Amino acid sequence: MKKKQFLKESDVTAESVFFMKRRQVLKALGISAAALSLPHAAHADLLSWFKGNDRPPAPAGKPLEFSKPAAWQNNLPLTPVDKVSGYNNFYEFGLDKADPAANAGSLKTDPWTLKISGEVAKPLTLDHDDLTRRFPLEERIYRMRCVEAWSMVVPWIGFPLHKLLALAEPTSNAKYVAFETIYAPEQMPGQQDRFIGGGLKYPYVEGLRLDEAMHPLTLMTVGVYGKALPPQNGAPVRLIVPWKYGFKGIKSIVSIKLTRERPPTTWNLAAPDEYGFYANVNPHVDHPRWSQATERFIGSGGILDVQRQPTLLFNGYADQVASLYRGLDLRENF
């Protein structure tokens, strides 16, 4: 089935409009001082567009060897590498979208240890080299949808999580998978200072049901645009679950633990009425403070680059994953 494309050449904003003075742009968008008083996550991405014309460098990671299976290639317009590497949420390095690229160079990613434990027959420990050599790597072009109602299309490189979990041999007691980011406050300013880190409790933790973790789409990601992940994108290994909001994509993972009970997750702990455990992309279930019916695609230009496009149920992966939630109330279990 041919996939719907929502971006047209006419959607791209003229260069003369993009380079309007900041005050003119704010006025044109109807953004008032009151709007800017909203909680940071609701508007920090918007303000990041007005930081000037400087662009962070492209990822400087080493080139990776990987295949490009036809099943994971498509004709979706890719988000440019400078946006993928320079427009990020990684609160351990600051709240502004440009902060991770500016501050994440302090993160030491080699050596690295990733432990797989819990309800498994064969606990595992992987080192830095294992992450790129133990499993065949493949490039997958995935949509990425942030809960803040913006989106990207990214050529991630990695291996299916189910291959790693299969080596550990989950026991019959395993129902969930818990993930944990490195805790290194000496390297991560947001873990040192609650103001810098958005008031979250660290280390960052996430979780999936076991069947979600075993789904072929769920990717342990070690690279982007042909190279190893840069620190601001979650080096050396992060999770990508393309049918869920981006905050489920935990970065810089040091622990994977299979559990009997549903594990706590950082954003659900911080604001349970706003961020659910499932976090499936759903245009029919709004965030309490903004609509999820549409999204802004982050393309090659600035804030006025494209028109909004419709949000797709499960981020366009409904055919592959909807059966996981048969009989589940998606409004209640958001």
Swiss-Prot record:
Instruction: Give UniProt keywords alphabetically.
Output: Metal-binding, Molybdenum, Oxidoreductase, Periplasm, Signal
A GO MF annotation of the entry reads:
oxidoreductase activity, acting on a sulfur group of donors, quinone or similar compound as acceptor
> What are its E.C. numbers?
1.8.5.-
Q: Where is the signal peptide?
A: 1-44
InterPro entries of this UniProt entry? MsrP (IPR022867), OxRdtase_Mopterin-bd_dom (IPR000572), OxRdtase_Mopterin-bd_sf (IPR036374), TAT_signal (IPR006311)
Q: Which GO terms describe its cellular component?
A: periplasmic space
Q: Which cofactor does it need?
A: Mo-molybdopterin
Q: Give the enzyme's main class according to its UniProt record, as a single word.
A: oxidoreductase
Q: Which reaction does it catalyse?
A: L-methionyl-[protein] + a quinone + H2O = L-methionyl-(S)-S-oxide-[protein] + a quinol; L-methionyl-[protein] + a quinone + H2O = L-methionyl-(R)-S-oxide-[protein] + a quinol
Q: According to the record, how does the cofactor bind? A: Binds 1 Mo-molybdopterin (Mo-MPT) cofactor per subunit.
Intracellular or extracellular location(s): Periplasm
Location, primary (coarse class): periplasm
- The reply on keyword Signal is yes
- The superkingdom of the source organism is Bacteria
Q: Name one GO biological process term.
A: protein repair
Modification note: Predicted to be exported by the Tat system. The position of the signal peptide cleavage has not been experimentally proven.
Which of this chain's residues are annotated to bind Mo-molybdopterin? 88, 91-92, 146, 181, 233, 238, 249-251
Q: What does this protein do?
A: Part of the MsrPQ system that repairs oxidized periplasmic proteins containing methionine sulfoxide residues (Met-O), using respiratory chain electrons. Thus protects these proteins from oxidative-stress damage caused by reactive species of oxygen and chlorine generated by the host defense mechanisms. MsrPQ is essential for the maintenance of envelope integrity under bleach stress, rescuing a wide series of structurally unrelated periplasmic proteins from methionine oxidation, including the primary periplasmic chaperone SurA and the lipoprotein Pal.
Tell me, how does this one assemble? Heterodimer of a catalytic subunit (MsrP) and a heme-binding subunit (MsrQ).
> Which PANTHER family does UniProt cross-reference here?
PROTEIN-METHIONINE-SULFOXIDE REDUCTASE (PTHR43032), PROTEIN-METHIONINE-SULFOXIDE REDUCTASE CATALYTIC SUBUNIT MSRP (PTHR43032:SF3)
Q: Which family does it belong to?
A: Belongs to the MsrP family.
Q: What is this protein called?
A: Protein-methionine-sulfoxide reductase catalytic subunit MsrP
